Amino acid sequence: MVTFFTKNDGKVSAIAKGAKRPKSKFSGTLEPFQKIAIDYSGRTSLKTLKSSECIEPFKEFCTRKNLYSAFYVNELINCMVKSNEDPIEIFNLYEQCILQLYDDSDTNKVLRNFEFNMMKVLGYEINFQSDYRSGDPLDANSFYTYAPQMGFTISDSGYGGEQLIEIREKKFSKENLELAKQIIKQTLDFYFEELNINSRSFFR
């Protein structure tokens, strides 16, 4: 079974009969990160793959970390996106992210931008604008605690308001990227309890 993410139909799972045979008609076209044109049929959620043609062949990533980051993006898409999601915006975000990962050495920045954008598209956007209790704008001189689904609220200790404002403005220092990663993971773990991202182990 192969899972595709398509621009028009979103996430599609299909059986590629005979794909493992040496002279399979699918040979060389079902590798990760290749842009391909596919034809499939079937009335159920599990389709039958009829043909696949490579449009853009696999390109080597500049580092192993970039490759692992791309696998992480694939797993995130597969876990977060449902079959009935509107695919076009997600497809464009995914394609842009993979293209950046081919050559960009700052994988943390690429991944955090992708995660934030994906959560916004899927309805899980984090509110870095205001305190969810009072409605007041985040204050650079205050501290905040964070609760997924609710947001940030002022506290005696916790995340610094200045850092949160910088993250909102995409001012990604090394420290801000690490904090953004922590907040995103907390959010994803809350909404997707069974989110099992195997490629996370590559970054430990």
Model-derived features with residue positions:
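Non-catalytic alpha-helical scaffolds and adjoining flexible linkers that form interface surfaces
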Residues: F5-R204
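Short aromatic-glycine-enriched beta-strand elements
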Residues: M1-T3
